[in-house]
């Protein structure tokens, strides 16, 4: 039996993510013009035809580089040659608030959500690969992240699906060559200014050279294990929250919980009280934890979103 080609391996991965969809459904695929998203678009187009699903390729032009409009038009032309009849270019404005990468990502997802709503798309496909996952885990380790962050990117979250987390970047490049798609190499992906690029170009190759091959595989396996653990811990914390008042939490009840559960309960309660999603760090939570486990009469803790946490009469009070 002949070895499966890179494109066929991508098609198999996409097929698994289409298994719960129905004929006539609309799906989006975000395409940057790079090898990963272009290969995903090719695999999705082939599999969508088999299931009579309507794929729309979406090119987000962040307008952050002088030739971004040209890149978007060239990408649209390549997708048209590959067989796409529905391609949308969305030019967006990135307001930088917390770093260029994070701000661009937030603006990109907002645009994708808007297009998904306007087209009634049931899923949005993203081209993150095994290499991206390994880089994410290593960056999380370097930053001292917790279980959830170290679990990397989810295969599915809300409408978003990442079928290529088991596929390598070399496979996506080979798949593009296989189908004749000319892909774009984003100069930002070669700039050592970015930590992710330094991990990709220096750290991972050094680990492979000094420790041995298979580092990306090992990191992605660890991410999957950690995601399963994080899901279980989150579920436990949700069950605790269902039994208590998240605005007035009993100190003895909180103190009796394992720290991993207590920290999740406190974090979730703070978000329920109005802290912006994703705004809490370990530095924010440590003084709140101390109100429970190292009480010395300290005052209230001020948190993002104007949330305040204080210990009052044996309770952790949020306002």
Go through each PLM region and give its residues.
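AMP-forming adenylation/ATP pyrophosphatase catalytic core
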Residues: 2-36, 56, 60, 91-94, ...
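Inter-helical turn/loop segments and adjacent helix faces that build the functional surface
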Residues: 206-218
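Core alpha/beta nucleotide-donor-binding catalytic domains of modification enzymes
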Residues: 1-202
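A structural signal for alpha-helical segments
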Residues: 99, 191-194, 214, 221, ...
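Short, surface-exposed loop/turn segments at secondary-structure junctions
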Residues: 186-190, 213-216, 278-279
């Amino acid at each position: 039996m002949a070895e499966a080609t890179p494109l066929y391996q991508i098609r198999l991965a996409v097929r698994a993510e289409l298994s719960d969809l129905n004929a006539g459904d609309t799906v989006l695929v975000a395409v940057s013009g790079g090898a990963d998203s272009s290969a995903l678009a090719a695999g999705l187009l082939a599999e969508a035809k088999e299931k009579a699903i309507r794929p729309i390729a979406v090119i987000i032009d962040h307008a952050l580089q002088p030739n971004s409009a040209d890149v978007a038009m060239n990408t649209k032309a390549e997708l048209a040659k590959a067989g796409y009849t529905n391609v949308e270019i969305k030019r967006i404005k990135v307001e930088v608030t917390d770093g260029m990468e994070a701000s661009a990502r937030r603006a990109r997802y907002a645009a994708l959500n808007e297009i998904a709503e306007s087209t009634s798309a049931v899923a949005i496909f993203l081209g993150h690969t095994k290499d991206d996952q390994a880089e994410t885990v290593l960056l999380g380790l370097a930053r001292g992240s917790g279980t959830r962050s170290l679990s990397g990117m989810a295969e599915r979250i809300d409408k978003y699906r990442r079928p290529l987390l088991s596929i390598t970047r070399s496979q996506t490049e080979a798949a593009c060559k296989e189908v004749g798609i000319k892909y774009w190499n984003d100069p930002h992906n070669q700039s050592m200014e970015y930590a992710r690029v330094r991990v990709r170009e220096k750290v991972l190759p050094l680990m492979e050279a000094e420790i041995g091959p298979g580092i990306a595989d090992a990191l992605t396996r660890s991410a999957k294990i950690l995601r399963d653990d994080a899901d279980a811990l989150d579920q436990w914390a949700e069950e605790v929250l269902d039994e208590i008042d998240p605005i007035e939490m009993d100190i003895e009840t909180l103190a009796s919980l394992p720290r991993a559960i207590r920290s999740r309960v406190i974090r979730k309660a703070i978000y329920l009280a109005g802290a912006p999603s994703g705004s809490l760090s370990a530095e924010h939570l440590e003084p709140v934890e101390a109100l429970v486990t190292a009480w010395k009469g300290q005052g209230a803790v001020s948190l993002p979103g104007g949330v305040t946490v204080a210990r009052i009469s044996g309770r952790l009070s949020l306002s």
